[in-house]
Amino acid sequence: MNASRSIFTVIAAMFVAAAAAPAHAIQFGLKDGPGAKFNNDDLALMMARVDAGLKSPTEGEVLEWKNAKTPASGSVVPLNKLTWNGMSCRRLRITNVYGEQKAQSVYKFCEKPAGKWKLVGPDNE
């Protein structure tokens, strides 16, 4: 499984968890947020930018995406790299838009020994 597919699986799981756990849904902005309306193509476009953000050497670079077939769009901004619990991590600001609805949060991803990235959760630091 490549890193993009692994991250896609994590984000998809996050959407499922949001539907099952209303408190987390509010925190992530997924239950009633724009991401709840994303189709598979929207998610794939977003995940390609998440993958690019994790690999980007540049902090603050805005990586935008848009699905021409839906009102879905967004951006990923790579923030700082850090060490957390002994793992190499990266913070990303992820903005999701669906029509007029917009949500933005900062998430922490950490690289596992096999080179796969894992979503650790929202980053409140």
Q: Where in this protein do the model-derived segments appear?
A:
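Surface-exposed, charged secondary-structure patches
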Residues: K69-S88
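Short beta-strand segments that buttress and anchor functional surface loops
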Residues: E64-W65, R91-V97
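Hydrophobic/aromatic beta-strand elements that line small-molecule binding cavities or substrate pockets
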Residues: V76-K81, R93-T95, S105-C110
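Extracytoplasmic
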Residues: G60, M87-C89, Q104
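N-terminal trafficking/processing presequences and adjacent post-cleavage segments
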Residues: A21-N67
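Positively charged n-region of N-terminal signal peptides that target proteins for export
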Residues: M1-R5
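Bacterial N-terminal signal peptides
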Residues: T9-A18
